[in-house]
């Protein structure tokens, strides 16, 4: 999931005045949806459809709008604001191939600083700024000619999803009951994207450089820019400081510090009690037990039990003409090596589900998917025919396990070499997706993911959270504990 870079021309500044605002009781938020779609397209698509999963719309366009309204209602019940939140919504032909696609994106279309009710010299997303100010800060400002220049949030979703040239067969599921099967759950996807627009994003920091936006909202600058409202809550455990007190160079490094950036807001830290004990993989070798290894379960295949024997580990060797490890059907040598075992397969060149399915077809009983760069991975993908368990581990862990498998062989016989036996367990002293102090971690892979890095929860969280960089099939439409941590973070920044 991506949060798009906002238009710099949409950044706004309000000079604080000495006026006294009248206190008024907070009320439930109101969200209005403004369609950008022309007749016969997107929300206005007249294609007849059957009701699905509680969505009673009779046309494709109507069902799409019904999901928007359903998700907006969820946010309305969870937020308080005396100012209407406006969302510009449209369906567009976004980037696609037969095997991948941009699902959609959303973000705050305007950002504000120095308005009554906000922290001085701090950037806020528009919907939150309006709530804190108690007024619509764009009121009276002429539109920029687009028709949506003064909205709070702008969203766009891929109108071609599921067509042969656009992630073929994986269309949006428009039901409201979460039973998406192999389709993409549009309600969960939209709930996530509106979360970005409401403020789940560092928004005014360029993560590739660490630069902030200047007070005028006209450019990212190395020095002198204003911080995001997020920054005081972003604490780097390596640098031992928060982003508010970092240089641009330090923020750039922190954005690619795997498992190193924690969120310190009181609501989120309290809510992090919902996180489960850290799942670990134990590996017993002929000479002893390796240190516990963190893992993240794959999004496909059977659910991994908390405690279980996984099996004997194995490695594979490169095959002639392969595009990447495990990306083609296994040859005779690799099939013999992994039959009845758990191969360690490195990431790269094809989808995780493809690698696991090829291993399954060769007789594997499970798969460990090792990252090919530093940092954790939570293997995504979908294939209902995968019936063996799999999980993601770090590159360093994969290298250590491969070395252990090679070192174990001499401890057996030629007919039956020594093996490394893997099992699943948990570490009750640590929370999955949190640092040593129990503070939830942000997404900071070692290779920057523009639009995703920092502005999501980390992928090691368990249970899966709405604001991770991918939409997991087990998500509910809840934004608060005990299912989720989205609302606690939004409360930390002022909601």
Which stretches of residues belong to each language-model region?
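Protease-associated
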Residues: 269-357
